[in-house]
């Protein structure tokens, strides 16, 4: 009887350790899955930003062809696009682990969006430009890009929120802390003034 009791203690310890290990493993896997969802959505955000950037050379070339078009507007777009391009690819790729890089990238993209909005607003003063087929095609493509950007940013924020909520709950927060920067909190896109709704870029007036 005494010998049987002597086994109870070690067995109980083994069971407890096994349960803890299983819980830690399950929590780790859950954080990994949620983190991968954030990474995937971050890639989507970059893709739609790139799609917008690819439209800019043709847009600038088109408006430059309009007589007496205000050069400061398309020069501002070109400058803003260049600022985005100056951000090192590694900084963009690793921005989810560096809030400063994330904020810098988001700000540069917002400034590019603002410059485009100003250019398009000025374009309304040039009916002949707006009547061209190339400009109307760019209008449709740009509107689609802005809609996709707003949509993918929202999806990214949703994925980041799901990760952060899981990470910050107890005892998950303790487990996340065991792995250092592996499970850092994910940054969010912040709404900019006037960004509550997607701009309606429409030149067919």
Please place each PLM-identified region on the residue numbering.
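A helix-centric hydrophobic-segment signal that preferentially recognizes long
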Residues: 1-205
């Amino acid at each position: 009887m005494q010998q049987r009791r002597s086994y109870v203690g070690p067995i109980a310890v083994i069971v407890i350790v096994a349960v803890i290990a299983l819980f830690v493993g399950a929590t780790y896997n859950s954080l990994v899955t949620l983190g991968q969802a954030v990474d995937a959505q971050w890639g989507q955000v970059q893709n739609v930003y790139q799609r917008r950037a690819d439209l800019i050379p043709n847009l600038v070339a088109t408006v430059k062809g309009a007589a007496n078009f205000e050069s400061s507007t398309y020069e501002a777009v070109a400058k803003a696009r260049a600022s985005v391009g100056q951000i090192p690819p590694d900084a963009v790729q690793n921005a989810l682990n560096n809030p400063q890089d994330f904020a810098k990238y988001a700000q540069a993209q917002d400034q590019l969006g603002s410059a485009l909005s100003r250019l398009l607003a000025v374009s309304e003063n040039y009916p002949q430009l707006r009547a061209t087929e190339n400009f109307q095609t760019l209008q449709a493509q740009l509107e689609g890009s802005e809609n996709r950007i707003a949509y993918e940013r929202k999806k990214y924020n949703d994925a980041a929120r799901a990760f952060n909520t899981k990470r910050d709950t107890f005892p998950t927060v303790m487990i996340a802390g065991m792995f250092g920067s592996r499970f850092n909190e994910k940054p969010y896109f912040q709404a900019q003034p006037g960004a509550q709704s997607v701009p309606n870029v429409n030149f067919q007036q």
